[in-house]
From Swiss-Prot:
<feature type="disulfide bond">
    <location>
        <begin position="90"/>
        <end position="187"/>
    </location>
</feature>
<dbReference type="GO" id="GO:0004867">
    <property type="term" value="F:serine-type endopeptidase inhibitor activity"/>
</dbReference>
<dbReference type="GO" id="GO:0005886">
    <property type="term" value="C:plasma membrane"/>
</dbReference>
<keyword id="KW-0560">Oxidoreductase</keyword>
<keyword id="KW-1003">Cell membrane</keyword>
<feature type="binding site" description="covalent">
    <location>
        <position position="148"/>
    </location>
    <ligand>
        <name>3-hydroxy-L-kynurenine</name>
    </ligand>
</feature>
<feature type="disulfide bond">
    <location>
        <begin position="239"/>
        <end position="263"/>
    </location>
</feature>
<keyword id="KW-0654">Proteoglycan</keyword>
<keyword id="KW-0964">Secreted</keyword>
<feature type="binding site" description="covalent">
    <location>
        <position position="136"/>
    </location>
    <ligand>
        <name>3-hydroxy-L-kynurenine</name>
    </ligand>
</feature>
<keyword id="KW-0999">Mitochondrion inner membrane</keyword>
<feature type="site" description="Inhibitory (P1) (chymotrypsin, elastase)">
    <location>
        <begin position="240"/>
        <end position="241"/>
    </location>
</feature>
<feature type="disulfide bond">
    <location>
        <begin position="311"/>
        <end position="332"/>
    </location>
</feature>
<comment type="similarity">
    <text>In the N-terminal section; belongs to the calycin superfamily. Lipocalin family.</text>
</comment>
<protein>
    <recommendedName>
        <fullName>Protein AMBP</fullName>
        <ecNumber>1.6.2.-</ecNumber>
    </recommendedName>
</protein>
<feature type="domain" description="BPTI/Kunitz inhibitor 2">
    <location>
        <begin position="286"/>
        <end position="336"/>
    </location>
</feature>
<dbReference type="InterPro" id="IPR012674">
    <property type="entry name" value="Calycin"/>
</dbReference>
């Protein structure tokens, strides 16, 4: 389960494509006696199929990703965190999905496009695999449907792969639109893939830029250093993609999310909160209160407790924190300085 957020990015792309979507879809039945609590935890997204023709444009770039499902901030939500490689960078996406009166059916609404996605858990044994179907309806293109296969481990039995294929075919997804993705390993948000210099140079020399408006063009940063861009307001850019990115808000001294269109924009644009904070925060963050935030991810991080004059560990909920948040004790001590314990005061501003 790469999650409804990632499904949404795929399905809404159909709004801009002239496709022949499935005119009718069979009624989707959820897993019998569905247990919400048993679907929580970590999953690997292993395969995808869709009636959306946009999938064929990116199939060679797709790989196995991870998804963590858990209780949401309210009783009516499910929290999702998806981590994947994208364009050589490890990207993390978070979101919240709405429960319905049907156990095993969830909704995700995107106000920008006025679209509501319906997602169904159609087959699962909870301990090994799960198959999701997600459908979208638009006035211009009718219905589209996407199938996703998830596993508790990066590999599944051949019989389960065939079961997924059968489910996808039965809802009108063509065989050449079913993709079993390669496993490139797990990643940490903000990490970049290591690429030999010769290959990187060759790619820059021979690969054309993608067409304007594709939603995948590089940022325009001019001559600014990345840290100099931290004082800029975020820029969505003119393209119509919907990539969740982070920007540094100097007023709140926190990294916050925004929807990046995929091209142009400016340098105050980061794949992960970690990358944003480590680039932009100032030493003033050490005097901020320690904020867990309203989400319930329970991530163990470090923060500087000004009252005690030392770095302490705390549980970060995963959203709406501030800059007083460090990813190791060493980073916290080096940044904020801890008198009397042998660490020098940090002079970076």
């Amino acid at each position: 389960m790469q999650g409804l957020r990632t499904l949404f990015l795929l399905l809404t792309a159909c709004l801009a494509s002239r496709a022949d979507p499935a005119s009718t879809l069979p009624d989707i039945q959820v897993q019998e006696n569905f247990s919400e609590s048993r679907i929580y935890g970590k999953w690997y997204n292993l395969a995808v199929g869709s009636t959306c023709p946009w999938l064929s444009r990116i199939k060679d770039k797709m790989s196995v990703s991870t998804l963590v499902l858990q209780e949401g901030a309210t009783e009516t939500e499910i929290s999702m965190t998806s981590t994947r490689w994208r364009r050589g960078v490890c990207e993390e996406i978070t979101g919240a999905y709405q429960k319905t009166d049907i156990d095993g059916k969830f909704l995700y609404h995107k106000s920008k496009w006025n679209i509501t996605l319906e997602s169904y858990v159609v087959h699962t044994n909870y301990d090994e695999y799960a198959i999701f179907l997600t459908k979208k309806s638009s006035h211009h293109h009718g219905l589209t449907i996407t199938a996703k296969l998830y596993g508790r481990e990066p590999q599944l039995r051949d019989s389960l792969l065939q079961e997924f294929k059968d489910v996808a075919l039965n809802v009108g997804i063509s065989e050449n639109s079913i993709i079993f993705m390669p496993d490139r390993g797990e990643c940490v948000p903000g990490d970049r893939e290591v690429e030999p210099t010769s290959i990187a140079r060759a790619r820059r020399a021979v690969l054309p830029q993608e067409s304007e408006g594709s939603g995948t063009e590089p940022l325009i940063t001019g001559t600014l250093k990345k840290e100099d861009s931290c004082q800029l307001n975020y820029s969505e850019g003119p393209c119509l993609g919907m990539q969740e990115r982070y920007y540094y808000n100097g007023a709140s001294m926190a990294c916050e999310t925004f929807q990046y269109g995929g091209c142009l924009g400016n340098g105050n644009n980061f794949i992960s909160e970690k990358d944003c904070l480590q680039t932009c925060r100032t030493i003033a963050a050490c005097n901020l209160p320690i904020v867990q935030g309203p989400c319930r991810a329970f991530i163990k991080l470090w923060a500087f407790d000004a009252a005690q004059g030392k770095c302490i560990q705390f549980h970060y909920g995963g959203c709406k924190g501030n800059g007083n948040k460090f990813y190791s004790e060493k980073e916290c001590k080096e940044y904020c300085g801890v008198p009397g314990d042998g660490y020098e005061e940090l002079i970076r501003s």
